Amino acid sequence: GADGIELNYGCPHGMSERGMGSAVGQVPEYCEQITGWVMQVARIPVIVKLTPNITNIVAPARAAVAARANALSLINTVNSITAVDLDTLEISPNIGGKGGHGGYAGPAVKPIALNMVSALGGDEVVRASGIPISAMGGISTWRDAAEFLLLGAGSLQVCTAVMHYGFRIIEDLCDGLSNWMDSKGFAS
């Protein structure tokens, strides 16, 4: 069985057009309602993954807290179009004559992620709930990791950097973060 469930309210990949993914994360009432349904039957931890494709990240976070989610994760990818082919005049990438938007990730989204983690870390309702925050979005180095932790994250997720540099990056990240924490006198 699974150790947990992540409700992905942030996916921009072809789901938002059908009222799923990031469309759910943009409507706090939907976020609370669906999370509540899952919490009624789940016997394992439920994490709500929030979309960055919203003006106020606090509203869906508070909705997830109200529905008693076990944790929050953020940010998912930023809805984007990466290019337009100037020869074919079509959105790129294009498969079978169809192009579309997708999710933008990696170091370029880090400032957005830091801002949103900070908003949740500083929100009185989210903070008072004690709900864990797991941060992602542009984490490539131990310095990136430290910034997210200082703004309110209790755990981190790294994907794009691992895809680019391999799993070795995690050991470097952990070593660098540990050394920095020791130099600052942080125990945890």
Stretch-by-stretch model annotation:
Residues 40-51, 122-136:
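Short beta-strand/loop segments at the ligand-binding rim of alpha/beta enzyme cores
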Residues 31-36, 58-62, 117-118, 145, ...:
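Generic structural signal for well-ordered alpha-helices
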Residues 12-29, 60, 67-129:
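Glycine/Thr-rich beta-alpha phosphate-binding loop at enzyme active sites
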Residues 2-5, 42-46, 68-70, 129-131, ...:
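Short, well-ordered coil/turn segments that N-cap beta-strands
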Residues 7, 49, 72, 120, ...:
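Conserved, mostly hydrophobic/aromatic
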Residues 54-67, 118, 122-129, 139-156:
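Catalytic cores of alpha/beta
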Residues 83-101, 149, 161-186:
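C-terminal helical cap(s) of enzyme catalytic domains, especially alpha/beta-barrels
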Residues 9-11, 67-82, 138-139, 144-172:
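Glycine-rich phosphate-binding active-site loops on the catalytic face of alpha/beta enzymes
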